[in-house]
Design a protein with these regions (language model features):
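Conserved adenine-nucleotide phosphate-binding loops and their immediately adjacent elements
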Residues: 2-36, 103-106
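Walker B catalytic acidic pair
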Residues: 138-142
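Phosphate-binding P-loop
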Residues: 37-46
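P-loop NTPase Walker A phosphate-binding motif
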Residues: 46-76
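Conserved NTP-binding/hydrolysis module of P-loop NTPases
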Residues: 84-107, 119-123
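A short hydrophobic beta-strand->loop->alpha-helix junction that borders the nucleotide-binding pocket
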Residues: 73-84, 111
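Mid-core helix/loop region of P-loop NTP-binding domains shared across ATPases and GTPases
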Residues: 103-137, 147-165
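Alpha-helical scaffold elements adjacent to nucleotide-binding pockets in ATP/GTP-utilizing enzyme cores
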Residues: 59-63, 88-96, 150-154
């Protein structure tokens, strides 16, 4: 009996509760994406400037979708103060890490979230796969200064992942 085994590749972007909808009609950004890829060979973090309404969020979402198996994202639209809360951001990252490293565990909502076990597993997985794990963060320039230290501590954990690349 010759049965084919179908391997289902996870679209991690589907599990980002803040992932924006992408318009059906798009401007080609291939040259930008090629430039990002080229820059990621040298730099770990890229920060993209852009005025409101120029399509930066759409470009970031498109780039994330291009790497949907190796991408964790968080988009802040600026309208929801709750979306800027470090605990909410950390929870979203936790869920996406769980889908990425296929290690699901029930999380007690009263307990503090610990990303460390996921980060250890992700580091191992990336080392053996030679792929980058992309982190796409949009709208972080809108975060109030009172929350920046808490969010900085989350990002510092992520920066420890060797094959991680960050796009803000």
């Amino acid at each position: 009996m010759n049965k084919k085994t179908e391997i289902k590749i996870e679209d991690v972007c589907r599990h980002s509760v803040t992932f924006p909808s992408i318009p059906t009609t798009l401007i080609s950004r291939k040259s930008y994406f090629d430039l990002f890829e080229e820059q990621f060979e040298t730099y770990k973090v890229l920060c993209l400037p852009g005025a409101e309404g120029v399509g930066l969020t759409t470009a970031l979402a498109e780039f994330a979708k291009m790497h949907n198996q190796y991408c964790i994202s968080y988009f802040i639209d600026g309208f929801s103060r709750l979306a800027m809360e470090p605990r909410i951001i950390e929870h979203s990252l936790y869920v996406q890490f769980a889908y990425f490293d296929k290690h699901f565990s029930l999380m007690n909502e009263d307990k503090e979230i610990d990303l460390s076990p996921h980060i250890v597993r992700v580091k191992r997985r990336l080392k053996s796969s030679k792929n980058y794990l992309y982190f796409i963060f949009d709208g972080f320039d809108k975060i109030p200064s009172t929350l920046k230290d808490s969010i900085r501590s989350i990002l510092t954990l992520l920066l420890d992942i060797d094959n991680a690349r960050f796009l803000f």
